Amino acid sequence: WFNKSHRRYGTLWAERFKSLLVEPTGRAIETVAAYIDLNPVRAGLVDDPKDYRFCGYGEAVAGNPDAQRGLLSLRNETDWSTAQAGYRLALFGTAAAPRDHAVSVTPEALQQVVASGGKLPLTTLLRYRIRHFTDGAVLGSQAFVQQQLAAYRTLHHRRARTAVRLMPALTDWGGLVTLRGLRKPALG
């Protein structure tokens, strides 16, 4: 009944969730973790991810030992306070505008800056939906993405019609590349 009345097909969650293979070390995993932890901020649920108990960062700040071990591993640290401070800086950026100002940046203003050739801080971009983090298939360093592409070609005994793609020149991505080139705008 639901599918017929809403002109849909499949299960209710069909096409809702996607997967992305992320390089498990370095800049790629930390960038994606920050992007995920900023989901409640992008949704307008909270101003600070520490206030949202259903995200990993909020759980870690609240004292959950499993979440804290995850952040320690992510930051490659042994001291919780150092790891927490470093990750918080990664979330908000040391040179970023005050949080309230950064949240109030509209998509139109963002597009104007991009059109003028200006680059935005990664911390500002992480407050928007970045399609490469959901539709890029593989995200990581160039060597990691090349390795995954070679494994795919070997496993399926065919040549994939894709190649390593650079992330859009909106900011300094720290060497991150993706497997899939996207035709639609990167943000939104």
Region annotations inferred by a language model:
Residues 1-188:
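Short Pro-Cys-Gly-centered "Cys-loop" motif that presents a nucleophilic cysteine in a tight turn
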